[in-house]
Amino acid sequence: NLTAIDQSTDTCTNNFATMNPLDNYYAQATFSEGNLKVATASSPTTYVTSTIGVTPNFKCYWEAKFDTTQSGNGEIGMVDKVTTGASAGGGASRLYYQRNGISVNDLGQVWGNNSNTGQSLGSLSTSDIICFAWDGTNNALYIRKNGDAWVNSGNPASGSSKTGAFVTPDSNITIFQAMGDQAGNTNSTASINLGSPPYSISSGNQDGNGYGNFEYAVPSGYFAINTKNLAEYG
């Protein structure tokens, strides 16, 4: 009784990233849908990361959506460190607390480097898809909701000018896609599409190499997170 959603495009010669159940020391999260849907526990406040680190100079695209929206408790984004053991920084283990952590919470607010950026995607529902485009060459992240304009008038094609981007303090970093809690009083659930979606896609967009299955168009020069793309461009 498998449907198309239950089938992965992953092969023995090309592996797509998923979320990593081994990076689960603090989070005590549960993983489903091929490790692309994550539900956090109600007490810890932390995050989990993806299985493939995106190396510097790679430009990647991914999508995600919240399956629960609970007043700013959930967050989805990227970070340059895993949480296993104490590497995330003791009690300050929220995703957006990290120096190179950038996230969108389930209120649509964009956070980074332990502060609210003042930018927002507007209100989010469980049907809204958050789009991320990371320019590793220029340490710049672009974010939008659905097919809307990129937040802060962002332009993923702007290169070193980083027009409207959320910029990490450090350059030349390896980043991971991440999901977690901003508050520890409840659990959050999100689905992450790193090229092989855990939810229904109506439009079916691919990157320039023909990889991935995304709801919205992949910006030119950005690619799904898989081993072939990283070998070619990473």
Model-derived features with residue positions:
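PRY/SPRY (B30.2) beta-sandwich protein-interaction domains
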Residues: N1-G234
